[in-house]
A protein has these predicted regions:
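Membrane-embedded alpha-helical bundles that constitute the cytochrome b-like, heme-associated redox core
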Residues: 1-161
Length: 161
């Protein structure tokens, strides 16, 4: 009997593989900690930028927290990118094939890509006239990220129960 090598339809995952899209504990808590730290550093930057301006003899100047918060925020992106990339095979691909939590998963991926794109734009090619727009596009979505992550987790747990 001849087996078909290629098909337009994917074979469903075996039951053991379906359950393997749950994250390991260290991965899950590392992601939670990094998202919380990114949220906190972004929030500190927002507060320093818009509410803690220092007025000196030459006018308004930046608050020292603004610079440090931005540096911490940029540094935290590196490990988050590494851990988010680790989700691709084990978590995202298998959950997608198992038809689990697709809408919130794709929303999470689109949000992370948007934040990466706008963050890159702010760092590399935003002109001074467009910087406020790129910045708002970044921090408005960034403030919504913890809520979207919570919703994604909540829906995933509800579906698995």
């Amino acid at each position: 009997m001849r087996t078909q090598k290629h098909s337009l339809h994917r074979r469903p995952l075996p039951n053991a593989a379906v359950q393997q899209f749950k994250l390991e504990t260290w991965h899950k808590y590392s992601l939670y900690a990094l998202v919380a730290a990114l949220f906190a550093s972004g929030l500190v930057w927002l507060l320093a930028r818009y509410f803690l301006r220092v007025t000196g003899e030459y006018g308004e100047s930046i608050h020292p927290l603004e610079h440090w918060a931005m540096q911490a925020h940029g540094a935290l992106i590196i490990p988050l990118s590494f851990l988010a990339g680790g989700l691709l095979f084990q978590h995202m691909r298998r959950a997608h094939r198992a038809l689990r939590n697709r809408y919130s998963g794709w929303s999470m991926l689109a949000t992370l890509l948007w934040l990466a794109l706008t963050g890159y734009a702010l760092y590399y090619f935003a002109s001074e006239s467009l910087r406020p727009y790129w910045s708002a596009a970044h921090w408005i979505v960034g403030l919504a990220l913890p809520l979207l992550l919570w919703l994604h987790i909540r829906l995933g747990r509800r579906l698995s129960a």
